[in-house]
From Swiss-Prot:
PANTHER family: ATP SYNTHASE DELTA CHAIN (PTHR11910). SUPFAM superfamilies: N-terminal domain of the delta subunit of the F1F0-ATP synthase. F(1)F(0) ATP synthase produces ATP from ADP in the presence of a proton or sodium gradient. F-type ATPases consist of two structural domains, F(1) containing the extramembraneous catalytic core and F(0) containing the membrane proton channel, linked together by a central stalk and a peripheral stalk. During catalysis, ATP synthesis in the catalytic domain of F(1) is coupled via a rotary mechanism of the central stalk subunits to proton translocation. This protein is part of the stalk that links CF(0) to CF(1). It either transmits conformational changes from CF(0) to CF(1) or is implicated in proton conduction. GO terms for cellular component: plasma membrane; proton-transporting ATP synthase complex. GO terms for molecular function: proton-transporting ATP synthase activity, rotational mechanism. F-type ATPases have 2 components, F(1) - the catalytic core - and F(0) - the membrane proton channel. F(1) has five subunits: alpha(3), beta(3), gamma(1), delta(1), epsilon(1). F(0) has three main subunits: a(1), b(2) and c(10-14). The alpha and beta chains form an alternating ring which encloses part of the gamma chain. F(1) is attached to F(0) by a central stalk formed by the gamma and epsilon chains, while a peripheral stalk is formed by the delta and b chains. Its main location: membrane. It comes from the Bacteria. Belongs to the ATPase delta chain family. This is ATP synthase subunit delta.
């Protein structure tokens, strides 16, 4: 529902990071901040507590992060607090990473298989996907024993299901339809 907002915030920060030549630094620092909020019980309570005022949350963030992160990154966090969007920081990072890949003409292909693909299979898959999408492909491989065999590939909203499990599912649907 809020993907559009997440993208707008991420794009605004990306443009600032790009101007400053600090894209990777901002992404890494934001990930560390998400981990800090998640793992520090006291900070997590402050961020999640609805009765702690926005100004109090902003003051706490300034105390923690001033001098430790870039001023413009801190300003971004304070805007998120002001707009009550700080709880969705992880989504902003995800969108910022997507924007970064888009700017570099890259796509991430999430690949699932029962056994790990060998280098030749990986390269063949990368070559075919690069040709299809006209972009540089980054493979993220995951093992999934429930697939029985074959390969499942997801790039954004596109899915290529070449698994035995997927074929069985297609057959089951056809049989149930008749």
């Amino acid at each position: 529902m809020y993907e559009y907002l997440d993208r707008r915030y991420a794009l605004a920060l990306y443009e600032v990071a790009e101007k400053n030549g600090k894209i990777d630094q901002y992404i890494e620092e934001l990930k560390q901040i998400v981990d800090l909020i998640k793992n520090n019980e006291e900070l997590s309570k402050i961020v999640h507590h609805p009765q702690i005022t926005t100004s109090k949350k902003k003051k706490i963030f300034k105390e923690i992060f001033t001098g430790k992160i870039d001023d413009e990154l801190l300003a971004f966090l304070l805007i998120l607090i002001e707009k009550d969007r700080i709880l969705y920081l992880k989504e902003k990072i995800r969108e910022m990473e997507k924007i970064h890949l888009e700017k570099q003409n890259k796509l991430v292909a999430h690949v699932k298989s029962v056994v790990s693909l060998n280098e030749e299979e990986k390269q063949s898959l990368i070559d075919k996907l690069s040709k299809k999408y006209n972009k540089t492909i980054i493979l993220k491989e995951e093992l999934d024993e429930t697939l029985i065999g074959g390969v499942y590939v997801r790039i954004g909203d596109d899915v290529i299901d070449g698994t035995i499990k997927g074929k069985f599912e297609e057959i089951r649907k056809k049989v149930m339809k008749n």
